[in-house]
Amino acid sequence: MSDRLTVLTSKSVFTGTGDLPFEGFVAVRGNRIEAVGTKCEVASYLTQADEVVDLGDRTVMPGLIDVHTFYTGWALRTLGSDLSGVADAKEAVSLLRAWKDDHPDCAAAFGHNLPETLASDAENANTAAVFDECFGDIPVVCFTPGAETCVLNAAASARYGFTSQACYAEKIWRMMSDFLALPEVRAGYSDYMSMLNERGVTAIKEMAFDDYYGFADEMARREESGELTVRVSMMSQPVGAGANLAYAREARERFRGPFVRFSGFNRMTDRGVWAGLAEMIDPYEDTADAGAAGKTVVEEPEWDLIENELRAIDADGFRYSLHCQGDGAVRRTVALYASLPRDEYGRLLRRHAITDLENSDPTDLVEFGKLGGICEVYPQILTLDRREDCLSMMRRQIGETRLLHSWNRRGMEDSGCTVCCGTDLPLLVPSLGESIYSACGGFFADGLPVNEANVLTLVELLRAWTAGGAYDLMREDEAGYARGRQTCRYLRARSGCVRPRLSRRTRSFG
Protein backbone atom coordinates (compact mmCIF):
# COMPACT_ATOMS: atom_id res chain seq x y z
CA MET A 1 0.00 0.00 0.00
CA SER A 2 1.25 3.52 -0.84
CA ASP A 3 2.65 5.61 2.02
CA ARG A 4 1.67 8.83 0.27
CA LEU A 5 0.00 11.40 2.57
CA THR A 6 -2.89 13.42 1.15
CA VAL A 7 -4.56 16.14 3.21
CA LEU A 8 -8.10 17.19 2.32
CA THR A 9 -9.11 20.57 3.72
CA SER A 10 -12.67 21.84 3.76
CA LYS A 11 -14.89 24.41 5.39
CA SER A 12 -17.36 21.57 6.00
CA VAL A 13 -16.12 18.29 7.50
CA PHE A 14 -18.87 15.97 8.73
CA THR A 15 -17.79 12.93 10.74
CA GLY A 16 -21.12 11.10 10.71
CA THR A 17 -21.40 11.20 14.50
CA GLY A 18 -21.27 14.91 15.33
CA ASP A 19 -24.18 17.30 15.27
CA LEU A 20 -22.67 19.82 12.87
CA PRO A 21 -19.96 19.97 10.22
CA PHE A 22 -16.85 21.99 11.04
CA GLU A 23 -13.99 23.64 9.19
CA GLY A 24 -11.10 21.23 9.23
CA PHE A 25 -9.22 18.46 7.46
CA VAL A 26 -8.91 14.75 6.80
CA ALA A 27 -5.41 13.30 6.41
CA VAL A 28 -5.20 10.13 4.33
CA ARG A 29 -2.11 7.93 4.08
CA GLY A 30 -2.47 5.49 1.21
CA ASN A 31 -6.12 4.49 1.46
CA ARG A 32 -6.35 4.80 5.24
CA ILE A 33 -7.40 7.76 7.36
CA GLU A 34 -4.53 9.01 9.51
CA ALA A 35 -6.21 11.96 11.20
CA VAL A 36 -9.32 14.13 11.29
CA GLY A 37 -9.33 17.51 12.97
CA THR A 38 -10.22 21.18 13.00
CA LYS A 39 -8.42 23.87 11.03
CA CYS A 40 -6.41 24.68 14.18
CA GLU A 41 -4.88 21.18 14.09
CA VAL A 42 -3.97 20.94 10.41
CA ALA A 43 -0.57 22.69 10.33
CA SER A 44 1.65 19.70 11.17
CA TYR A 45 -0.08 17.55 8.54
CA LEU A 46 0.29 20.20 5.86
CA THR A 47 4.06 20.25 6.34
CA GLN A 48 4.25 16.45 5.89
CA ALA A 49 1.76 16.20 3.03
CA ASP A 50 2.65 14.90 -0.41
CA GLU A 51 -0.54 16.51 -1.70
CA VAL A 52 -3.01 19.04 -0.32
CA VAL A 53 -6.50 19.25 -1.81
CA ASP A 54 -8.57 22.26 -0.80
CA LEU A 55 -12.22 21.36 -1.30
CA GLY A 56 -13.51 24.78 -0.32
CA ASP A 57 -17.13 24.59 0.79
CA ARG A 58 -17.66 21.02 -0.43
CA THR A 59 -18.51 18.67 2.41
CA VAL A 60 -16.08 15.90 3.31
CA MET A 61 -17.85 12.97 4.95
CA PRO A 62 -17.65 9.19 5.39
CA GLY A 63 -18.86 6.92 2.61
CA LEU A 64 -22.58 6.25 2.34
CA ILE A 65 -24.02 2.93 3.52
CA ASP A 66 -26.99 1.44 1.66
CA VAL A 67 -28.69 -1.10 3.92
CA HIS A 68 -31.06 -2.73 1.40
CA THR A 69 -29.74 -3.81 -2.00
CA PHE A 70 -30.32 -6.68 -4.44
CA TYR A 71 -27.60 -7.58 -6.92
CA THR A 72 -29.84 -10.42 -8.08
CA GLY A 73 -32.40 -7.83 -9.19
CA TRP A 74 -29.82 -5.46 -10.65
CA ALA A 75 -28.32 -8.26 -12.77
CA LEU A 76 -31.66 -8.90 -14.50
CA ARG A 77 -31.35 -5.55 -16.28
CA THR A 78 -28.46 -6.85 -18.38
CA LEU A 79 -29.13 -10.59 -18.30
CA GLY A 80 -28.68 -12.44 -21.56
CA SER A 81 -29.08 -10.99 -25.05
CA ASP A 82 -29.82 -7.30 -25.56
CA LEU A 83 -33.18 -7.22 -27.34
CA SER A 84 -33.63 -3.45 -27.41
CA GLY A 85 -33.55 -3.21 -31.19
CA VAL A 86 -35.94 -5.99 -32.15
CA ALA A 87 -39.16 -5.22 -34.00
CA ASP A 88 -40.94 -8.51 -33.43
CA ALA A 89 -40.68 -11.85 -31.63
CA LYS A 90 -38.96 -13.54 -34.59
CA GLU A 91 -36.08 -11.05 -34.41
CA ALA A 92 -35.83 -11.72 -30.69
CA VAL A 93 -35.62 -15.45 -31.42
CA SER A 94 -32.57 -14.93 -33.66
CA LEU A 95 -30.69 -13.04 -30.96
CA LEU A 96 -31.73 -15.48 -28.25
CA ARG A 97 -30.54 -18.44 -30.33
CA ALA A 98 -27.18 -16.77 -30.85
CA TRP A 99 -26.87 -16.13 -27.12
CA LYS A 100 -27.83 -19.72 -26.29
CA ASP A 101 -25.25 -21.04 -28.77
CA ASP A 102 -22.63 -19.02 -26.89
CA HIS A 103 -23.86 -20.45 -23.56
CA PRO A 104 -24.34 -24.17 -24.18
CA ASP A 105 -24.06 -25.02 -20.48
CA CYS A 106 -26.88 -22.69 -19.47
CA ALA A 107 -30.24 -24.40 -19.09
CA ALA A 108 -32.16 -21.44 -20.52
CA ALA A 109 -32.02 -18.58 -22.99
CA PHE A 110 -32.22 -15.14 -21.38
CA GLY A 111 -32.80 -11.67 -22.75
CA HIS A 112 -33.14 -8.10 -21.51
CA ASN A 113 -34.54 -4.83 -22.86
CA LEU A 114 -37.37 -6.62 -24.66
CA PRO A 115 -39.56 -3.81 -26.05
CA GLU A 116 -42.67 -3.19 -23.96
CA THR A 117 -44.79 -3.59 -27.08
CA LEU A 118 -43.89 -7.29 -27.18
CA ALA A 119 -44.64 -7.80 -23.48
CA SER A 120 -47.88 -5.86 -23.08
CA ASP A 121 -51.05 -7.61 -21.99
CA ALA A 122 -52.21 -7.88 -25.58
CA GLU A 123 -48.94 -9.19 -27.04
CA ASN A 124 -47.36 -11.11 -24.16
CA ALA A 125 -49.10 -14.39 -24.98
CA ASN A 126 -48.29 -14.04 -28.69
CA THR A 127 -44.59 -13.47 -27.98
CA ALA A 128 -44.54 -16.41 -25.57
CA ALA A 129 -46.19 -18.60 -28.23
CA VAL A 130 -43.40 -17.77 -30.70
CA PHE A 131 -40.83 -18.70 -28.06
CA ASP A 132 -42.70 -21.98 -27.45
CA GLU A 133 -42.66 -22.79 -31.15
CA CYS A 134 -39.00 -21.93 -31.70
CA PHE A 135 -37.41 -23.22 -28.49
CA GLY A 136 -39.63 -26.13 -27.47
CA ASP A 137 -38.49 -27.48 -24.11
CA ILE A 138 -35.68 -24.92 -23.68
CA PRO A 139 -36.77 -22.27 -21.15
CA VAL A 140 -36.80 -18.69 -22.43
CA VAL A 141 -37.14 -15.64 -20.18
CA CYS A 142 -36.93 -12.09 -21.53
CA PHE A 143 -37.18 -9.01 -19.33
CA THR A 144 -38.39 -5.58 -20.39
CA PRO A 145 -36.30 -2.44 -19.66
CA GLY A 146 -35.83 -2.14 -15.91
CA ALA A 147 -36.82 -5.82 -15.51
CA GLU A 148 -40.24 -4.93 -14.12
CA THR A 149 -42.11 -7.28 -16.46
CA CYS A 150 -41.13 -10.21 -18.66
CA VAL A 151 -42.18 -12.76 -21.25
CA LEU A 152 -41.48 -16.44 -20.65
CA ASN A 153 -42.38 -19.57 -22.54
CA ALA A 154 -44.12 -22.66 -21.19
CA ALA A 155 -40.83 -24.45 -20.55
CA ALA A 156 -39.60 -21.55 -18.41
CA SER A 157 -42.87 -21.37 -16.52
CA ALA A 158 -42.63 -25.09 -15.75
CA ARG A 159 -38.96 -24.93 -14.68
CA TYR A 160 -39.05 -21.72 -12.68
CA GLY A 161 -42.62 -21.47 -11.43
CA PHE A 162 -43.32 -17.76 -11.92
CA THR A 163 -45.48 -15.78 -14.32
CA SER A 164 -45.06 -12.71 -16.49
CA GLN A 165 -47.30 -10.80 -14.06
CA ALA A 166 -45.04 -11.52 -11.07
CA CYS A 167 -41.38 -11.79 -12.04
CA TYR A 168 -39.76 -9.73 -9.28
CA ALA A 169 -36.74 -11.04 -7.38
CA GLU A 170 -38.58 -12.99 -4.67
CA LYS A 171 -40.56 -14.90 -7.32
CA ILE A 172 -37.67 -15.94 -9.56
CA TRP A 173 -35.64 -17.81 -6.94
CA ARG A 174 -35.74 -21.07 -8.91
CA MET A 175 -33.98 -19.29 -11.77
CA MET A 176 -31.13 -17.93 -9.67
CA SER A 177 -28.90 -20.99 -9.78
CA ASP A 178 -29.03 -20.80 -13.60
CA PHE A 179 -28.25 -17.12 -14.09
CA LEU A 180 -26.00 -16.42 -11.09
CA ALA A 181 -23.58 -19.04 -12.43
CA LEU A 182 -23.10 -17.18 -15.72
CA PRO A 183 -19.56 -15.73 -16.13
CA GLU A 184 -20.89 -12.34 -17.23
CA VAL A 185 -23.18 -12.10 -14.21
CA ARG A 186 -20.28 -12.85 -11.89
CA ALA A 187 -18.05 -10.39 -13.73
CA GLY A 188 -20.86 -7.83 -13.60
CA TYR A 189 -20.38 -7.44 -9.86
CA SER A 190 -17.41 -5.20 -10.67
CA ASP A 191 -19.64 -2.79 -12.59
CA TYR A 192 -22.18 -2.96 -9.76
CA MET A 193 -19.54 -1.90 -7.24
CA SER A 194 -18.28 0.86 -9.53
CA MET A 195 -21.82 2.22 -9.85
CA LEU A 196 -22.14 2.26 -6.05
CA ASN A 197 -18.71 3.83 -5.54
CA GLU A 198 -19.46 6.56 -8.08
CA ARG A 199 -22.47 7.49 -5.95
CA GLY A 200 -20.44 7.62 -2.76
CA VAL A 201 -21.48 4.21 -1.41
CA THR A 202 -18.75 2.21 0.33
CA ALA A 203 -20.81 -0.42 2.19
CA ILE A 204 -24.08 -2.28 1.58
CA LYS A 205 -26.37 -4.82 3.18
CA GLU A 206 -27.06 -7.22 0.34
CA MET A 207 -30.15 -9.42 0.18
CA ALA A 208 -28.84 -12.86 -0.80
CA PHE A 209 -31.80 -15.19 -1.31
CA ASP A 210 -31.66 -18.48 0.62
CA ASP A 211 -28.03 -19.71 0.35
CA TYR A 212 -27.29 -17.29 -2.53
CA TYR A 213 -27.48 -20.11 -5.08
CA GLY A 214 -23.72 -20.42 -5.59
CA PHE A 215 -22.92 -16.71 -5.65
CA ALA A 216 -21.46 -16.86 -2.13
CA ASP A 217 -18.49 -18.60 -3.77
CA GLU A 218 -17.99 -15.56 -6.00
CA MET A 219 -18.05 -13.26 -2.96
CA ALA A 220 -15.46 -15.45 -1.22
CA ARG A 221 -13.26 -15.43 -4.33
CA ARG A 222 -13.43 -11.65 -4.63
CA GLU A 223 -12.61 -11.21 -0.94
CA GLU A 224 -9.60 -13.49 -1.23
CA SER A 225 -8.31 -11.88 -4.43
CA GLY A 226 -8.77 -8.31 -3.18
CA GLU A 227 -11.32 -7.37 -5.86
CA LEU A 228 -13.93 -5.76 -3.59
CA THR A 229 -14.37 -2.00 -3.31
CA VAL A 230 -17.58 -2.17 -1.26
CA ARG A 231 -18.01 -3.76 2.16
CA VAL A 232 -20.81 -6.31 1.87
CA SER A 233 -22.96 -7.59 4.74
CA MET A 234 -24.97 -10.47 3.31
CA MET A 235 -28.50 -11.21 4.53
CA SER A 236 -30.25 -14.47 3.69
CA GLN A 237 -33.82 -13.82 2.55
CA PRO A 238 -35.75 -17.11 2.78
CA VAL A 239 -37.87 -17.69 -0.33
CA GLY A 240 -37.36 -21.28 -1.47
CA ALA A 241 -37.53 -22.62 2.09
CA GLY A 242 -37.51 -21.36 5.66
CA ALA A 243 -34.55 -19.70 7.34
CA ASN A 244 -31.54 -21.96 6.83
CA LEU A 245 -29.64 -21.74 10.11
CA ALA A 246 -27.12 -24.38 9.08
CA TYR A 247 -26.13 -22.23 6.10
CA ALA A 248 -26.08 -19.13 8.31
CA ARG A 249 -23.67 -20.72 10.79
CA GLU A 250 -21.39 -21.80 7.96
CA ALA A 251 -21.53 -18.36 6.33
CA ARG A 252 -20.80 -16.63 9.64
CA GLU A 253 -17.60 -18.63 9.97
CA ARG A 254 -16.69 -18.39 6.29
CA PHE A 255 -17.04 -14.64 5.88
CA ARG A 256 -14.91 -12.91 8.49
CA GLY A 257 -12.70 -10.76 6.29
CA PRO A 258 -12.55 -6.97 6.10
CA PHE A 259 -15.09 -6.80 3.27
CA VAL A 260 -17.62 -9.65 3.37
CA ARG A 261 -19.61 -10.66 6.45
CA PHE A 262 -22.78 -12.65 7.00
CA SER A 263 -25.27 -10.44 8.83
CA GLY A 264 -28.44 -12.48 9.38
CA PHE A 265 -31.87 -12.81 7.79
CA ASN A 266 -34.42 -10.64 6.00
CA ARG A 267 -38.09 -11.35 5.34
CA MET A 268 -41.16 -9.60 4.00
CA THR A 269 -44.17 -9.46 6.32
CA ASP A 270 -46.89 -7.50 4.53
CA ARG A 271 -46.83 -5.60 1.22
CA GLY A 272 -48.30 -2.46 -0.34
CA VAL A 273 -51.16 -0.27 0.85
CA TRP A 274 -52.36 0.15 -2.74
CA ALA A 275 -53.11 -3.59 -3.01
CA GLY A 276 -54.66 -3.91 0.44
CA LEU A 277 -51.71 -6.10 1.43
CA ALA A 278 -50.28 -3.74 4.04
CA GLU A 279 -51.55 -4.93 7.42
CA MET A 280 -53.26 -2.04 9.20
CA ILE A 281 -54.26 -1.65 12.86
CA ASP A 282 -57.75 -0.48 11.90
CA PRO A 283 -59.67 -1.61 8.80
CA TYR A 284 -59.15 -0.04 5.39
CA GLU A 285 -61.58 2.71 4.41
CA ASP A 286 -64.92 1.84 2.80
CA THR A 287 -63.56 3.41 -0.39
CA ALA A 288 -60.56 1.06 -0.54
CA ASP A 289 -59.60 -0.79 -3.72
CA ALA A 290 -58.44 -4.40 -4.19
CA GLY A 291 -61.14 -5.86 -1.97
CA ALA A 292 -59.59 -4.33 1.15
CA ALA A 293 -62.61 -2.32 2.36
CA GLY A 294 -63.50 -3.20 5.94
CA LYS A 295 -60.48 -5.48 6.37
CA THR A 296 -57.18 -4.90 8.14
CA VAL A 297 -55.35 -6.82 5.39
CA VAL A 298 -56.44 -8.81 2.34
CA GLU A 299 -53.91 -11.62 2.83
CA GLU A 300 -52.58 -12.04 6.36
CA PRO A 301 -48.79 -12.35 6.63
CA GLU A 302 -47.32 -15.64 7.84
CA TRP A 303 -46.99 -14.47 11.43
CA ASP A 304 -46.64 -17.94 12.98
CA LEU A 305 -43.78 -18.78 10.63
CA ILE A 306 -42.18 -15.38 11.22
CA GLU A 307 -42.37 -15.72 15.00
CA ASN A 308 -40.88 -19.21 15.01
CA GLU A 309 -38.08 -18.15 12.69
CA LEU A 310 -37.37 -15.03 14.72
CA ARG A 311 -36.97 -16.93 17.97
CA ALA A 312 -34.66 -19.50 16.40
CA ILE A 313 -32.62 -16.82 14.63
CA ASP A 314 -32.27 -14.72 17.77
CA ALA A 315 -31.28 -17.75 19.88
CA ASP A 316 -28.52 -18.58 17.39
CA GLY A 317 -27.05 -15.09 17.66
CA PHE A 318 -28.26 -13.71 14.31
CA ARG A 319 -30.29 -10.62 13.57
CA TYR A 320 -33.55 -10.34 11.59
CA SER A 321 -34.79 -7.49 9.41
CA LEU A 322 -38.56 -7.61 8.93
CA HIS A 323 -40.05 -5.56 6.10
CA CYS A 324 -43.27 -3.82 7.20
CA GLN A 325 -45.41 -1.33 5.27
CA GLY A 326 -48.62 -1.08 7.32
CA ASP A 327 -48.95 0.21 10.87
CA GLY A 328 -50.45 -3.13 11.91
CA ALA A 329 -47.40 -5.03 10.66
CA VAL A 330 -45.11 -2.58 12.45
CA ARG A 331 -47.07 -3.07 15.69
CA ARG A 332 -46.97 -6.88 15.40
CA THR A 333 -43.24 -6.79 14.71
CA VAL A 334 -42.44 -4.46 17.61
CA ALA A 335 -44.41 -6.79 19.91
CA LEU A 336 -42.48 -9.81 18.62
CA TYR A 337 -39.16 -8.07 19.17
CA ALA A 338 -40.25 -6.99 22.66
CA SER A 339 -40.78 -10.65 23.59
CA LEU A 340 -37.13 -11.52 22.91
CA PRO A 341 -34.31 -11.56 25.49
CA ARG A 342 -33.01 -8.09 26.35
CA ASP A 343 -30.11 -6.57 28.28
CA GLU A 344 -30.27 -4.83 31.65
CA TYR A 345 -31.37 -1.61 29.94
CA GLY A 346 -34.30 -3.28 28.20
CA ARG A 347 -32.62 -3.18 24.79
CA LEU A 348 -32.57 -6.07 22.34
CA LEU A 349 -29.51 -8.31 22.45
CA ARG A 350 -29.44 -8.58 18.64
CA ARG A 351 -29.66 -5.76 16.13
CA HIS A 352 -33.10 -6.56 14.82
CA ALA A 353 -34.56 -4.05 12.38
CA ILE A 354 -37.75 -3.02 10.63
CA THR A 355 -37.44 -2.09 6.96
CA ASP A 356 -39.54 0.47 5.05
CA LEU A 357 -42.15 1.50 7.70
CA GLU A 358 -44.30 3.23 5.10
CA ASN A 359 -47.03 3.76 7.71
CA SER A 360 -46.52 3.51 11.48
CA ASP A 361 -48.34 4.52 14.64
CA PRO A 362 -46.18 6.96 16.67
CA THR A 363 -46.74 4.99 19.88
CA ASP A 364 -45.14 1.92 18.32
CA LEU A 365 -42.11 3.95 17.28
CA VAL A 366 -41.68 5.01 20.91
CA GLU A 367 -41.79 1.37 22.03
CA PHE A 368 -39.35 0.37 19.31
CA GLY A 369 -36.98 3.12 20.39
CA LYS A 370 -37.00 1.77 23.95
CA LEU A 371 -35.89 -1.59 22.54
CA GLY A 372 -32.97 0.02 20.72
CA GLY A 373 -34.66 -0.74 17.41
CA ILE A 374 -33.28 0.01 13.97
CA CYS A 375 -35.42 1.62 11.24
CA GLU A 376 -34.20 0.95 7.70
CA VAL A 377 -35.99 3.61 5.64
CA TYR A 378 -36.06 4.42 1.92
CA PRO A 379 -35.25 8.16 1.92
CA GLN A 380 -35.70 8.56 -1.86
CA ILE A 381 -39.01 6.73 -2.13
CA LEU A 382 -41.22 9.78 -2.76
CA THR A 383 -39.27 10.59 -5.93
CA LEU A 384 -40.94 7.65 -7.68
CA ASP A 385 -44.37 9.30 -7.79
CA ARG A 386 -46.26 12.49 -8.39
CA ARG A 387 -47.99 13.70 -5.23
CA GLU A 388 -51.64 13.35 -6.18
CA ASP A 389 -51.09 10.00 -7.91
CA CYS A 390 -49.81 8.64 -4.60
CA LEU A 391 -51.93 10.55 -2.10
CA SER A 392 -55.25 10.01 -3.85
CA MET A 393 -54.61 6.27 -3.63
CA MET A 394 -53.56 6.52 0.03
CA ARG A 395 -56.69 8.53 0.91
CA ARG A 396 -58.93 5.93 -0.75
CA GLN A 397 -57.18 3.12 1.07
CA ILE A 398 -56.47 4.42 4.58
CA GLY A 399 -57.91 7.93 4.83
CA GLU A 400 -56.49 11.33 5.72
CA THR A 401 -55.69 10.74 9.41
CA ARG A 402 -53.55 7.66 8.88
CA LEU A 403 -51.92 9.32 5.89
CA LEU A 404 -50.34 11.71 8.42
CA HIS A 405 -48.51 8.71 9.90
CA SER A 406 -46.82 7.85 6.60
CA TRP A 407 -43.05 8.19 6.06
CA ASN A 408 -42.65 9.38 9.66
CA ARG A 409 -38.85 9.55 9.92
CA ARG A 410 -39.20 12.40 12.42
CA GLY A 411 -41.06 10.09 14.80
CA MET A 412 -38.39 7.41 14.42
CA GLU A 413 -35.57 9.82 15.20
CA ASP A 414 -37.35 11.45 18.13
CA SER A 415 -38.23 8.04 19.60
CA GLY A 416 -34.58 7.06 19.84
CA CYS A 417 -34.56 4.52 17.03
CA THR A 418 -31.41 4.17 14.96
CA VAL A 419 -32.37 5.42 11.50
CA CYS A 420 -30.44 4.21 8.46
CA CYS A 421 -30.92 4.41 4.70
CA GLY A 422 -31.66 1.85 2.00
CA THR A 423 -32.74 2.05 -1.61
CA ASP A 424 -34.21 -1.38 -2.35
CA LEU A 425 -31.79 -1.27 -5.29
CA PRO A 426 -32.68 -1.72 -8.15
CA LEU A 427 -36.00 -0.06 -7.22
CA LEU A 428 -33.96 3.07 -6.55
CA VAL A 429 -30.32 3.88 -7.22
CA PRO A 430 -28.46 5.63 -4.36
CA SER A 431 -28.55 9.42 -4.70
CA LEU A 432 -27.69 11.68 -1.81
CA GLY A 433 -29.32 14.64 -3.53
CA GLU A 434 -32.57 12.78 -4.18
CA SER A 435 -32.66 11.59 -0.57
CA ILE A 436 -32.23 15.13 0.79
CA TYR A 437 -34.96 16.32 -1.58
CA SER A 438 -37.35 13.58 -0.45
CA ALA A 439 -36.48 12.85 3.20
CA CYS A 440 -35.60 16.40 4.30
CA GLY A 441 -37.97 18.32 2.04
CA GLY A 442 -40.79 15.78 1.88
CA PHE A 443 -41.05 16.34 -1.88
CA PHE A 444 -42.56 14.04 -4.47
CA ALA A 445 -41.22 13.83 -8.03
CA ASP A 446 -43.27 16.87 -9.07
CA GLY A 447 -41.86 19.06 -6.29
CA LEU A 448 -45.01 19.03 -4.15
CA PRO A 449 -44.59 18.18 -0.44
CA VAL A 450 -46.27 15.82 2.00
CA ASN A 451 -46.17 15.48 5.80
CA GLU A 452 -43.50 18.14 6.26
CA ALA A 453 -43.67 17.58 10.03
CA ASN A 454 -42.33 14.05 9.48
CA VAL A 455 -39.04 14.90 7.74
CA LEU A 456 -35.46 14.68 8.99
CA THR A 457 -32.99 17.51 9.24
CA LEU A 458 -30.05 17.45 6.85
CA VAL A 459 -27.60 16.44 9.59
CA GLU A 460 -29.92 13.65 10.75
CA LEU A 461 -30.15 12.30 7.20
CA LEU A 462 -26.38 12.40 6.68
CA ARG A 463 -25.95 10.63 10.00
CA ALA A 464 -28.48 7.99 8.90
CA TRP A 465 -26.56 7.42 5.65
CA THR A 466 -23.30 6.98 7.56
CA ALA A 467 -23.24 6.23 11.30
CA GLY A 468 -26.75 4.75 11.28
CA GLY A 469 -25.86 2.38 8.48
CA ALA A 470 -22.59 1.40 10.15
CA TYR A 471 -24.46 0.48 13.33
CA ASP A 472 -27.04 -1.51 11.36
CA LEU A 473 -24.29 -3.48 9.62
CA MET A 474 -22.44 -3.97 12.93
CA ARG A 475 -19.46 -2.15 11.41
CA GLU A 476 -19.37 0.98 13.55
CA ASP A 477 -15.76 0.19 14.49
CA GLU A 478 -14.76 0.12 10.81
CA ALA A 479 -16.80 2.85 9.11
CA GLY A 480 -16.67 6.59 9.67
CA TYR A 481 -13.78 8.84 10.57
CA ALA A 482 -11.27 7.27 12.88
CA ARG A 483 -7.60 6.54 12.46
CA GLY A 484 -7.00 3.46 10.29
CA ARG A 485 -10.38 3.43 8.60
CA GLN A 486 -10.70 3.55 4.85
CA THR A 487 -11.10 6.77 2.98
CA CYS A 488 -14.00 9.09 2.49
CA ARG A 489 -16.29 10.76 -0.02
CA TYR A 490 -16.99 14.41 -0.64
CA LEU A 491 -20.06 16.32 -1.80
CA ARG A 492 -20.38 19.24 -4.18
CA ALA A 493 -22.41 21.29 -1.72
CA ARG A 494 -21.99 22.79 1.71
CA SER A 495 -24.01 20.75 4.18
CA GLY A 496 -24.91 23.86 6.10
CA CYS A 497 -26.65 25.57 3.18
CA VAL A 498 -28.18 22.83 1.05
CA ARG A 499 -31.87 23.56 0.59
CA PRO A 500 -33.93 20.39 0.07
CA ARG A 501 -35.83 21.83 -2.90
CA LEU A 502 -32.53 22.46 -4.69
CA SER A 503 -30.74 19.38 -3.40
CA ARG A 504 -31.26 17.16 -6.44
CA ARG A 505 -28.13 18.74 -7.92
CA THR A 506 -26.06 17.51 -4.96
CA ARG A 507 -23.78 14.63 -5.94
CA SER A 508 -21.18 12.53 -4.17
CA PHE A 509 -17.80 11.52 -5.54
CA GLY A 510 -14.96 9.25 -4.49
Segments (PLM) and residue ranges:
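Divalent metal-binding segments
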Residues: D3-T9, F14, G18-Y247, G272-D282, ...
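A short helix-to-beta-strand connector/capping loop
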Residues: Q48-A49, L228, G257-R261, L348-R351, ...
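Active-site-proximal glycine-rich helix-loop-beta segment
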Residues: H68, G372, R489
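Non-cysteine beta-strand/loop elements that form the S-adenosyl-L-methionine
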Residues: F70, G257-L277, G373-T383
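Extended low-complexity acidic/polar segments
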Residues: G136-D137, R254-P258, T287-A288, V366-L391
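His/Asp/Glu-enriched, well-ordered alpha-helical/loop segment
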Residues: M176-S177, R311-Y320, G328-H352, L357, ...
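Acidic (Asp/Glu)-rich catalytic clusters
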Residues: R222-S225, E250-V260, R347, F368-K370
